[in-house]
Design a protein with these regions (language model features):
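Non-catalytic structural scaffold of enzyme domains
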Residues: 1-218
Length: 218
């Protein structure tokens, strides 16, 4: 599936690619990087790097999907930088559907979060990686449950900074802002209307439409 997405984006003549999904980064990044010449980055390594800079007691928590936790990639990257660090992973599979249902402030979501995070609170972590792109939308709730003593790390933010550096290093960074009434293009493989509604609820730009593509054609 990640390869099909890559093939489609190549038809759009992209100059760089961010695999902005922790699970896809964990499972497909290394393979995809070997297949194209454009710069490609994932979100796992940037998140791991900033967590290593942030922790004071070398106890780092990671919440993510089951696939990301099972891959062990966050722990691998963290141990490359801080071999002495203890990494505690916790899969939180219900967070994604709760966010997509628009239940971020629902009492049910707080109850689910409290049960997921109880184990991490008992481990005395001081840094917690939000290892899924949906989870920063629950940042306020997660922070409230974990307490001020735990620093939350959003890999997406760190990835954006790394992308800027990467574009500058390759001499392909643009110094102009996107022009036109609709300078952004959005493509989805399914559920275009749901994507538009969800995106308009969280993004600072208005998304009039998202184009649905047949990913199987790639």
């Amino acid at each position: 599936f990640s390869r099909q997405i890559l093939h489609f984006l190549q038809t759009r003549d992209v100059k760089a690619l961010v695999i902005a999904c922790n699970t896809a980064s964990a499972l497909a990044l290394e393979t995809i990087q070997k297949e194209v010449d454009i710069p490609i980055i994932g979100v796992v390594k940037p998140g791991a790097k900033v967590a290593c800079k942030t922790t004071r007691n070398n106890r780092i928590g990671v919440i993510a999907t089951k696939a990301t936790i099972s891959s062990g990639l966050y722990a691998d990257f963290i141990h490359q930088i801080r071999p002495e660090a203890e990494v505690i992973g916790k899969a939180c599979p219900l967070f994604v559907p709760l966010v997509e249902e628009g239940w971020r402030k629902d009492p049910v979501t707080r109850e689910v979060a409290a049960r997921y995070l109880e184990e991490l609170k008992d481990k005395d972590i001081d840094t917690l990686i939000l290892g899924c792109t949906h989870y920063p939308l629950l940042r306020s709730l997660i922070g409230d449950i974990m307490g001020d003593q735990v620093t939350l790390v959003n890999p997406a933010y760190e990835t954006a900074l790394q992308l800027k550096e990467l574009l500058q290093e390759h001499g392909i960074a643009s110094d102009t802002k996107p022009q036109g009434e609709n300078p952004y293009e959005f493509y989805v493989s399914d559920a275009a209307e749901s994507f538009r509604d969800f995106a308009n609820a969280i993004l600072p730009i208005d998304i009039d439409r998202a184009k649905k593509i047949n990913i199987e054609a790639y």
